[in-house]
Amino acid sequence: MNPLKYLFAAIFICCLAACQPKTKSTVPVVGFVDAFEDETISQARLGFVAALKDSGFSEDKKNIKIEYRNAQGDIPTLTQIVNYFISEPVDLLATCTTLSSVTAVQKTKTIPIFEMVSPTPARMNVLDASGKAPANLFGAVDDLEYIDTSFSIIPKVLKPKNGKLVVGMIYNQSEPQSADAMQRIKGLADKLNITLIALPLNTSADAQLVTQSLLDKNIDAFFANPDNTVFASFETIKKNCDQKNVPIFTSESGLVKRGAVLAFGADIYQWGYQAGEQAAQYLKSHKTDGLKPEMVKIRKRVYNPEMVKKYKISLPPNFEPVK
């Protein structure tokens, strides 16, 4: 045969192969979407995978495939990731933090979404006109009531430098949960006779500048609220607060391990585990009957021994050292 004919034949075969439809995986595929890289938030994925494994689904057994993508804080990349998983399509989406969950809800109405480290559907503003959550949204969520307990601890364990306690915080104006938390804390601060100074921070790149500006206002304490930007910028925040001897309080137990004084809040690993239990139930039955977004179940009162000693804090009852 003429060599050119061999070449044309090879090209023809390749074209035929390229035109064939994608072969659906014989095992269920989970598309796990993380909005950004963070040491604390990453515990949710570990918990989610552990729950699947405890229910019999693991990549070691080759009876499930977990595709992981991280947007590294970039919204266009996050959208591309979700669109890619939908086009595959994956059997279910696991979304970690608010941005991932909202993006997934906006992009698909059919693929089941199991959210974690995210607020209630109402706080994400994804309810329909009749007040119902998306029919394909499940997983574990949280509201903001626990923040009251966390913030109210501050005046019980810390004395003001001057006459009135001054607490500083930063928040992300573009993140509904963060903005809602700031408003809630502001109302609570008024009731507790605390002066709250809140500054917007919409990108971790500005963390140094905004934190220093806050510290220049002579605050007594810093409150780290549930905010993706706070998580991503925490080491910068802590470094600046340490230099000014300003203790950090929080509602997020994972941040205590990273240097906050104490917290009453959800265990991030268990939050992911709870969402994973729902996902496993769906994978077993291929039905969503009885599933819905449910409140996170496990919260912890934890403290950082090193920070408690540094700031001479007298602990409230029922707090345990962070592990």
Question: Residue spans of the language-model regions?
Answer:
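Short hydrophobic alpha-helices and adjacent helix-cap/hinge residues
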Residues: 2-8, 19-323
